[in-house]
């Protein structure tokens, strides 16, 4: 007798989990497979199979800035100001330069590696996890575009500069003799140092790299951190005027890192490349971060600007809140098809809010 057709019906019946009981378990008891299985009174293997089938999904919840009513109202107005209501699309954002600071660390406390079967596991040590070597950088980027006058692509990576100082070693050590220049990171950035960085680094870089920089008003968007200067800062405006630049300093809404392309994704891309290096001192760390900044393709930056436009759309639909999922529009697929837009079209749902 041929029983091959009955093969799928053999073995014990599958044990399913009542999915309605999953949501009844408090979230703080659903942090691991072990605790979730214990709360549901099921074996871990049964729960794991449900996760593998997609019946239960894992989720990583990250803290987001708390927003007041005024914060949310400011976010809505800021996002609406980037929409061309007549054409029903977002502005191209070609006249905006985003600036922001970020700490870059020598290494992460926890790193993941893929090892061979017999390979020895790496052993990493540090004197203190709290005081890891780090350097703060200021980055300035804009929307990539084709430079018609130079007939080439302008990547719009204005620059990346470390907040550091060079001191002379006062005494000898096993690493260097007395009198050797030693690079040290600035522990905290003040408004004086921030202003100097804008005047002596950012503005000259804009004048050098930006095509037809004197023919348009360039907005420099910053967040509301305490060391940042006021939009009407006379020293900055005077320095821009001497360079022949028409610069306007603008502030993004408070508690809104998601409205800056650097915080939205570009810093993470730099950091991912930087951690592929293995710096052993501050000079090597600075070089690794600067090399990562230069290696990133301009298309990555352009994609983050398109994501920013979708984030602004979500922000308005959420009435200024930040309880949304970062939308995906298959940018790489659209690019391969030659259909990647310069600006995102306003959805019908968003038009009703304008």
Describe the residue ranges of each PLM region:
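C-terminal anion-handling pockets and recognition modules
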Residues: 92-93, 262-354
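A short, amphipathic alpha-helix used for macromolecular contacts
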Residues: 2-52, 76-93, 277
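Short, solvent-exposed loop/turn segments at secondary-structure junctions
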Residues: 43, 54-56, 102-105, 111, ...
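Short, basic/hydrophobic alpha-helical segments
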Residues: 26, 191-219
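Mobile genetic element proteins and their domesticated derivatives, centered on retroelements
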Residues: 21-22, 36, 47, 79, ...
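Extended, low-complexity cationic-aromatic segments
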Residues: 72-204
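Acidic/histidine-rich, metal-coordinating catalytic segments
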Residues: 99-101, 211-229, 252-260
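RNase H-like polynucleotidyl transferase catalytic core
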Residues: 60-67, 124-127, 221-224, 238-261, ...
């Amino acid at each position: 007798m041929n029983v091959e057709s009955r093969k799928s019906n053999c073995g014990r019946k599958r044990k399913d989990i009542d999915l309605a009981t999953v949501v009844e378990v408090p979230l703080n008891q659903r942090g691991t497979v072990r605790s979730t299985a214990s709360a549901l009174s099921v074996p871990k293997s049964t729960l794991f199979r449900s996760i593998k089938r997609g019946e239960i999904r894992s989720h990583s919840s990250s803290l987001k800035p708390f927003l007041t009513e005024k914060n949310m109202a400011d976010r809505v107005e800021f996002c609406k100001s980037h929409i061309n209501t007549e054409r029903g699309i977002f502005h191209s954002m070609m006249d905006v330069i985003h600036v922001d600071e970020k700490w870059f660390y020598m290494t992460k406390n926890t790193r993941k590696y893929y090892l061979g079967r017999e390979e020895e596991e790496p052993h990493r040590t540090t004197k203190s996890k709290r005081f890891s070597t780090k350097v703060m950088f200021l980055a300035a980027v804009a929307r990539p575009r084709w430079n018609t006058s130079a007939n080439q692509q302008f990547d719009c990576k204005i620059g990346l500069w470390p907040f550091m100082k060079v001191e002379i070693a006062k005494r000898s050590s096993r690493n260097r003799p007395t009198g050797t220049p030693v690079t040290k990171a600035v522990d905290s950035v003040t408004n004086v140092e921030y202003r100097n960085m804008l005047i002596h680094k950012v503005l000259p870089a804009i004048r050098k790299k930006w095509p037809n920089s004197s023919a348009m008003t360039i907005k420099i968007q910053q967040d509301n951190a305490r060391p940042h200067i006021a939009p009407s800062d006379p020293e900055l405006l005077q320095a821009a005027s001497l360079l022949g630049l028409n610069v306007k300093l603008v502030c993004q809404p408070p508690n809104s890192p998601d409205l800056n392309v650097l915080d939205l994704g570009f810093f993470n891309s730099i950091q991912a490349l930087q951690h592929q290096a293995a710096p052993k001192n501050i000079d090597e760390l600075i070089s690794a971060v600067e090399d990562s900044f230069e290696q990133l393709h301009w298309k990555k930056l352009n994609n983050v600007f398109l994501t920013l436009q979708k984030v602004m759309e979500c922000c308005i639909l959420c009435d200024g809140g930040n309880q949304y999922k970062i939308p995906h529009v298959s940018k790489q697929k659209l690019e391969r098809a030659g259909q990647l837009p310069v600006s995102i079209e306003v959805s019908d749902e968003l038009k009703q809010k304008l």
